Each structure stands twice: as structure tokens, then as C-alpha cells.
């Protein structure tokens, strides 16, 4: 059995969970998330917690045990607190701004790159070089942050580009001159 899957998911008072077969709906103060879980796992709601158990002893069932528990836990945390990813833009002349809902990034190309957020995602820009992506679905927040980073990934020589705030860029030495 999965060590992660063994621990039950605690449900706060403000959150309601509806289990309908393999579809789990979580409603909370920040919104509602709905997800279809993979087969091979059973869900039981007891008072203010959800217990996830593998339905069989087969490998595919045991593989999905911890995954489903973590997905439910992420949904509960998303509707209560939400998720956010912070990115930094490094480089002369590189900046970002929000126009309406779209994020406009000037990252050294001949044109600014515009990104429209999917439903439930918001962009926030502080001081032209710090971008915060926030929402209730951890997966979508991470994907949107990765898309923004892929506009201009950080390069190892000068460190220019878009990077996560806590990301360390391993620097390389430049070419040495003729000797």
C-alpha cells in the first residue's frame, strides 16, 4: 500500500465534498472543482475526512492509490487557500504588464507576447518584473506558469530570461580568450 494513500484527507468545515462513483466534486469558499478519478480506487467519506483505498490488490490499483489521495488533497487545499506560482523576469528591457485579463510579456522578441488566462486563473504583475499566477486548480496554475516561463527560459551564461522565483540557475563560465 502507498504510504501517502494510507493517510486520510481532512475536510475543513467550509468545504463540502460530493462523491458520485469516480467523480469527486469539492466546493469551498474560493470555488468548485470537479475531477474524474482513475479506476481501481474506492473512496469512503467518514465525518470530516475521506479515506482512499485500493479496490483490488492488483498493481494498477496500488499505483493509483496515493495519486488519488493527493489529487483530492490538492482539490481541498485549492478551494480553501488556492495556489500561486511566482515568476521573475531577468534582463534589460524585459518586462510584463496586465492589460484587462491578458498578460503582455516583452522578453526581447520583435513583438510582445500576449497570454490569455483560462477560466479560474488570474495574472498579477508587481514592479514589471514579478508575475504571480494564481487560481484554485494546482495543475492549471503550474501549467500556466510553465507556459509563461517557456516564452524565454533562463539561459546559463548571464541568467537572463523568465524563471520561477525560487529557481536556481546554474551558471556556466563563458569562453576564455585566446592564449
Curated annotation (Swiss-Prot):
It comes from the Bacteria. The keyword Nucleotide-binding does not apply. GO terms for molecular function: rRNA binding; structural constituent of ribosome. InterPro entries: Ribosomal_uL6-like (IPR000702), Ribosomal_uL6-like_a/b-dom_sf (IPR036789), Ribosomal_uL6_a/b-dom (IPR020040), Ribosomal_uL6_bac-type (IPR019906), Ribosomal_uL6_CS (IPR002358). This protein binds to the 23S rRNA, and is important in its secondary structure. It is located near the subunit interface in the base of the L7/L12 stalk, and near the tRNA binding site of the peptidyltransferase center. The keyword Ribonucleoprotein applies. One of its GO terms (biological process) is cytoplasmic translation. Part of the 50S ribosomal subunit. Belongs to the universal ribosomal protein uL6 family. Keywords: Ribonucleoprotein, Ribosomal protein, RNA-binding, rRNA-binding. This is Large ribosomal subunit protein uL6. GO terms for cellular component: cytosolic large ribosomal subunit.
Amino acid at each position: 500500500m502507498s504510504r501517502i494513500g494510507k493517510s486520510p484527507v481532512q475536510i475543513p468545515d467550509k468545504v463540502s465534498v460530493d462523491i458520485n462513483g469516480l467523480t469527486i466534486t469539492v466546493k469551498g469558499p474560493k470555488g468548485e472543482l470537479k475531477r474524474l478519478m482513475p479506476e481501481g480506487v474506492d473512496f469512503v467519506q467518514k465525518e470530516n475526512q475521506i479515506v482512499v483505498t485500493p479496490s483490488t490488490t492488483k498493481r494498477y490499483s496500488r499505483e493509483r492509490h496515493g495519486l488519488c489521495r493527493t489529487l483530492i488533497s490538492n482539490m481541498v487545499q485549492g478551494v480553501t487557500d488556492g495556489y500561486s506560482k511566482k515568476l521573475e523576469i531577468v534582463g534589460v528591457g524585459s518586462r510584463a504588464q496586465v492589460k484587462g485579463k491578458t498578460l503582455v510579456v516583452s522578453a526581447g522578441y520583435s513583438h510582445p507576447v500576449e497570454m490569455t488566462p483560462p477560466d479560474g486563473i488570474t495574472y498579477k504583475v508587481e514592479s514589471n518584473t514579478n508575475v504571480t499566477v494564481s487560481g484554485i486548480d494546482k495543475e492549471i496554475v503550474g501549467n500556466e506558469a510553465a507556459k509563461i516561463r517557456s516564452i524565454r527560459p533562463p539561459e546559463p551564461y548571464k541568467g537572463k530570461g523568465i524563471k520561477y522565483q525560487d529557481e536556481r540557475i546554474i551558471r556556466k563560465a563563458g569562453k576564455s580568450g585566446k592564449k
